[in-house]
Regions:
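Hydrophobic cores of alpha-helical transmembrane segments in multi-pass integral membrane proteins
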Residues: 1-24, 36-65, 79-99, 115-149, ...
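Cytosolic juxtamembrane amphipathic/interface segments immediately preceding
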Residues: 100-114
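A cross-kingdom feature marking solvent-exposed beta-strand/loop segments within repeated
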Residues: 155-156
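Soluble secreted/lumenal catalytic domains
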Residues: 260-263
């Protein structure tokens, strides 16, 4: 994975590969503007990443479904029972005789959510791998003086294929993996079973079906995309995700509510911040997933600001912090050393993220495009506000690093990244 990422990064930094992030056809194979060698190395790196992702997901599924596991399941038993199909069949008077009783002997909701997210991850990896191989074939053909015709590939079909796969990153990696960690950590932290666990399994299945048909919200600004696709996939089916994610958030919050009184520990506090980030980022996504409103917000700073920066930085970022704050005491029996640094991290990151998103969103609503350099001062006040928010986040992150190093010890932290022989004799046990 590291080799693939570095190969992609180096091909852009030194190889000057400059196709847009979306890799819209035929830009990646327009070698009059895209460096040939940079393109080839970028696609090789991307292929390495995608193959590694496929190996990762294979390892996950093979671990859960391993025949050496006394609680082993076939693949279809896993899907049927984990997603609650036997319960649905009972509603219609049918009995699934081959069903596995996951209520007592099987998979926790966390594993079900990870399995569900991994399905999207596999789809994403396959789609991006095929898109990358296609570009690589064109690059190698050009390298050997036998250029292929870019017109042989329909640009609109390519866009739909590309975004169908790429959107699975948001659905599988961001939404479902996040939900799975909520399902795991919240019951552990508050000492109560997850609220509505049986319903949650069905919600996970429903979101799997919905996620297959939402990719067109990335193409609402494409005039050549058929209107019925923009309305059906880009708007109405996309709105279905707000029901599934809303039910997920409701189950998480109700679990905390019914466990009162609860101690607002650092991990629980950051989980609440994560939920807040998904609420804000999800609502701005709802605004964008509208054929009419997207005419105003498409490709503006509104998209990266209050939408996916909030989802990733606040929603996912604070969840990662929650996991770290929860696991360190669990695994090392050492409490986080400085509580006030935890609070500084929390408020600096949360307030900074909201302020940054607000500045970018206000600029976007006034027409500031993303990926565009402005020489005028028209949008500078909004970007100044966004910069203040980013600096607050930096302060919060610095507080986090200082606290973790102080808790575990500098040499113990360095040992995670450096060979042990370099640190021989210098490591000391962390103080409890």
């Amino acid at each position: 994975q590291t080799i693939g990422v570095l190969t992609c990064w180096l091909s852009c930094f030194f190889g000057m590969f400059n196709s847009l992030y979306t890799l819209y056809w035929p830009l990646p194979v327009s070698y009059d503007r895209v460096p040939l060698w940079g393109s080839i190395f970028f696609m090789v790196g991307a292929a390495v990443i995608m193959v590694n992702v496929l190996l990762f997901t294979f390892n996950l599924f093979s671990t859960v479904l391993s025949k050496s596991n006394p609680r082993s399941y076939t693949f279809w038993q896993f899907l049927r029972a984990a997603f609650g199909i036997p319960r649905l069949m009972k509603l219609f008077g049918k009995e699934d005789t081959a069903a596995v009783n996951l209520d007592y002997n099987g998979l926790p909701v966390f594993i079900v959510a990870v399995g569900r997210g991994s399905i999207d991850t596999v789809i994403n990896a396959i789609v991006l791998l095929t898109a990358g191989v296609l570009i690589l074939v064109y690059g190698l053909a050009a390298l050997f003086q036998a250029p292929l015709d870019p017109g042989a590939v329909d640009a609109l079909i390519y866009k739909n294929w590309f975004w169908w796969g790429l959107d699975m990153v948001a659905d599988g990696n961001v939404l479902m993996y996040t939900a799975g960690v909520w399902y795991l950590l919240i019951p552990m932290l508050v000492g109560r079973k997850l609220f509505g666990e049986s319903v949650v399994r069905t919600v996970i299945m429903a979101d799997l079906l919905i996620s297959m048909g939402v990719w067109s919200h990335h193409l609402l600004g494409e005039r050549v995309q058929p209107l019925f696709m923009r309305l059906l996939s880009g708007q109405f089916i996309t709105w279905g995700e707000f029901f599934t994610m809303g039910l997920t958030i409701f189950a998480a919050l109700m679990t905390i509510w019914l466990a009162r009184p609860v101690k607002l520990t650092p991990p629980l506090k950051f989980i609440l911040g994560s939920i807040f980030g998904f609420i804000i980022g999800g609502m701005t996504g709802l605004v964008q997933a509208n054929v009419g409103l997207n005419l105003v917000t498409h490709n503006t700073q509104w998209v990266p600001g209050p939408h996916f920066h909030v989802l990733l930085l606040i929603g996912v970022g604070m969840l990662v912090a929650a996991v770290i704050y929860a696991l360190i005491p669990m695994l090392t029996k050492i409490e986080i050393r400085t509580p006030w640094l935890v609070n500084l991290h929390f408020w600096g990151w949360l307030v900074g993220g909201v302020v940054m998103a607000y500045g970018m969103g206000m600029a976007g609503s006034r027409g500031m495009l993303r990926r565009t350099l402005y020489e005028t001062t028209l949008y500078q006040p909004y970007m100044a506000v966004a910069m203040v928010g980013a600096l607050l986040m930096a302060v919060g992150f610095l507080a986090f690093l200082v606290n973790i190093v102080a808790t575990l010890g500098l040499m113990n932290v360095l040992s995670l990244f450096m060979p042990e022989k370099w640190l021989a004799g210098r490591q000391a046990p962390a103080e409890a």
